[in-house]
């Protein structure tokens, strides 16, 4: 063999040796793939500059590069090295990838990118667990096309360590785009740049939000942080600005600026809608625009005392009374109170046709409104019911119970909401001495349309956040000590009182409900503040007036409307509206918007109470059909129908068998009802008792409706008091209403006698 033939034999031997090494690598890779997890080729681990960043600190990357490496449109489906999509990953690999993605987005430190240098690989830390990085040899790079394993840094075992190329003593960095599976790099067209601009912009926005907040959040949804109690949003002089309460200001300017920066332009928030709404009138510029955002605190009680009455929401519309008693009767004797029959609506239901509509229906007692009230004989039954209910962790007083509703061929299981009431939640005063001294009516406002989950402490926090320091909060309850949706709030300062009166309405937004709470001045029975001689009939809540008026003075001051402002009169109740010191004081009233007709009033926003005490007879005058006539906001254009007969519905109408079998108070015979068609003026003058006994000054659980005073019918356009009839409508500001008290009446028996006799009819014209 000559020396010229030796160079010819070396390539053949090298080729055979390379072929053996390739077969050996294929066999080893096959065995390795069976024991190790399959790694997507697109997540290629490239060599990291260890001297620059360290072995345990790979070069920082961006989310954009990581996303782009998962999308390779230049690889065809028939290619051997086709990318494995995200849907081909196992569950563990998906979870690991998502964790690494979060680490890259949250803990990323941006570095300066050198022009002309490719972006480092984004998945080096992820694949470092599975495949060790190996440097490919020069011979493999020049003589062979890279296999699928060479993409992960794998090379022939017999490649000498000294033959690996070095650039300045440092390993050469490569990226997945530069490798491109051994193909030549193609220049990206202008279309590719246009398509990637949107993705790049979204990625940069995502990284900004993540870096600011510390956790991944959606891009198009602005983060809304809630304080421990809430925040208030009210309009200012400029329609494009809003101001927040002290609670919302505590978050600082950083939160406000970030919230404005990352709010989507396509998302119209409630605040923007309220700002863009034009004012309804100059006098009502601040009304119906304040909103409180917050969360109800979790309730925690020690040995609570529950009301025997509970709210049951979400019941089927065709459920029967028998089905309800069958579901709740296992906890104790109970009765059903249907919507519209409770105390706060009973006074206004003078139309007998609407009352008999339920009895004429196919389903006797159908709950068309979707809720009912259950009244138990013993409060311990309520505690037993709550033990069988499910409750959300950290809930604010909502419970859930499953009832059975019988269908034609099957039995339906329906989950309903239970809202109990703890009697101690009806009052909240920071200073207990106020219960003995009494509240100041000149700093007290009336609130109506309260939600059933709003306790006195919750209302105290809301009003204090919105308007100022609150002294005491009292909620009105019925004879079962269940709230009727109204209450009174006493402020410490007059400034907070006037601010609440000027606001008029307050929107309460929580994760559980949204409610529009009404705020009115707490009125007293007093004389007109203009003439100081006549009794006041109405109250003007406009800040320029803010005084009591009689009929004559109101017509003189507001007859022409020279100032161009809106002056809405609020009807003054009777003399019983004076503040009473004690926990049993109840107002039992609410008011409604003047623009809202009575036919469209929802039962949840029309709270008018009529508390009937079984121990005393009730004097009832002509009841008003319009609920807004009972307290404020009666316009001159509204028509009133005066009926000559009083309509009274008992709390429940059980069958005679039920009345015999049960003996608790709500099934006792209804009290005696008297109708007096004589016009009455307030305050009333009672006839002194024959035996000199004291006349009862008030009854905490009763009220009465009275006809208009005779002085009102002094024009030809109005009817006289002698020709009142159901067929003849008349214009009327509103009915005189006893504000939770009975008129003064004398009884034949003394105060110590157990038997009650019929009262003498007092002469109200004295």
Swiss-Prot record:
Low complexity bias locations: 589-602
PANTHER family on file: CYTOPLASMIC POLYADENYLATION ELEMENT BINDING PROTEIN CPEB, CYTOPLASMIC POLYADENYLATION ELEMENT-BINDING PROTEIN 1
Chain intervals for the UniProt region annotation (Disordered): 1-35, 131-179, 216-299, 578-602
Its job: Cytoplasmic polyadenylation element binding protein that binds to and regulates the translation of specific mRNAs.
RNA-binding among keywords: yes
Segments forming domain RRM: 310-332
Composition-biased stretches (Polar residues): 233-256, 276-289
CDD domains registered for this protein in UniProt: Bbox1 (cd19757), RRM1_CPEB1 (cd12723), RRM2_CPEB1 (cd12725)
UniProt-recorded name of the protein: Cytoplasmic polyadenylation element-binding protein 3
A GO cellular-component term linked to this record: neuron projection
Annotated SMART domains: RRM (SM00360)
A GO molecular function held by the record: translation factor activity, RNA binding
Taxonomy, superkingdom: Eukaryota
Keywords: RNA-binding
